[in-house]
Amino acid sequence: MNLKNHSNKFHFKCLECGKETEPSVFSLKCDCNGVFDIVYDEFSQQYFPRMPIENFDRLYLGEGNTPVLSFPEFEKFFDIKSFWMKLENISPSGSFKDRGSATLINAALNESVLEFVEDSSGNAGASIAAYAAKAGMNSHIFVPKKTPQVKIDQIKVYGSNIHLIEGPRQSSTIAAQEFSKKNNLIYLSHNYSPYFCEGMKYFSYEIKETFNNDITDIVIPVGNGSLLIGCFKGYQELIESSQIKKMPKLHCVQAEGFNPIESEMKGEKWIFNPSDSSTIAGGIAVSEPPRKNQVIQSILESNGSAISVNDESISKWHKKFNFLRF
């Protein structure tokens, strides 16, 4: 299914104060410090998702249209009607982040960006580096020093300038911001930029194309929450254009020790303790997601839920998955 090249007129709107402004990859935060969302100027009845980019083909690496597999063993184990997994790991760079990277780098290309700074826990950095290479851009990717070597090597293979930063994930963000200011380079943050989340909407359309309106629940691992936000926005469009009648419940899964979204939804006070927080789920080890409120709103409006899991549980279910599968 080719869902490319369908754009609409749009503007930025602050999710905190409601201020509207002209869209630009150079605009990451409002004067009130809130993050922007993309709002389209006209309602669309078209089948395709409304997108802020006209030409995806120029940077297309094969992102999207990932397969889904059924797991009868899990259906029996959990006593549920159906259990499916969407295999985002076969995306060009190995993660769902390619959906957002394609949109963000295309937007940057439209504004003649030649060099930029980004930070990541690994997956987004590799993805952004891949699309930057395709676009002929010079990228500086900041990642924690403890990032798995395979991700560091992957970023290097794409030709990016990699910066290894000591300390927790947030330290890489701070270092990237300081570097961009010092060197007068754009900070092209996938966590702050609304373009990145927008690219995730294709995920919803692909599920609808495969299952129509039969999916009742979608479980998503959440660090910054771009996939969950994009999934929610995609389903909003599908409902508005009368292609489906009901939105699936969106469920957020966080790593224990990095669960600010779950904690807030449960009314619990959560304070990040870097000396006592580590997880094998490095891709979602995010202590300060900039779009936390947007993630929570998306979960609530879909009647979903949020939980956190510890490393012991993650390891246990990895083994159980292999046992049930094979």
Positions of predicted regions on the chain:
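PLP-dependent amino-acid enzyme catalytic core
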Residues: 1-326
